[in-house]
Amino acid sequence: MRRWLLVGAAVWLSGCASVASDPEPLTAGAALKDKDGKDVGVATLVQTPDGTRIAVTGYRLPPGTHGIHIHAVGDCKPPDFASAGGHFNPTAKQHGTLNPAGPHSGDLPNLVVADSGEAGMDITTKAVTLEPGPTSLLDGKGTAIVIHAAADDQKTDPAGNSGARIACGVVAK
């Protein structure tokens, strides 16, 4: 009897040792800066089972509605942030969530900034990932999150008529 108890305890303990804890989710972030290098926000990205969660907090931004996109190059040289390239579009679609031939992987909903200059956005998308692959935000040349001066009309190719780039942040682990 004692022998069976020892065998049972050994089997139970070996089962406990093989239970792995869930790995930490992949995360990345982007410090958003304006053309003068001042901090104007932060983006936090987390890989979840439902897609990539993108949370943006903005401050000291001009009030109103602004286009916000993921751009194809992880480089934010002021003052115009043209170094960030065009919208992240590894699937070769047209711009805009309202465009039947779209959207780009980097198309996001507009960011609404209050009169106080503060803004917040929290979305989850399956269009991009932090994991390796063609839609990864961390592969190749990297990517950047860019806030534009005007609202994105969500249909006009290639950039939704959202105007000049007013803030930029490189997506990094």
Where are these regions (language model features)?
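N-terminal leader/targeting pre-sequences
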Residues: S14-T65, I70-K173
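Sec-dependent bacterial lipoprotein signal peptides
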Residues: M1-S14
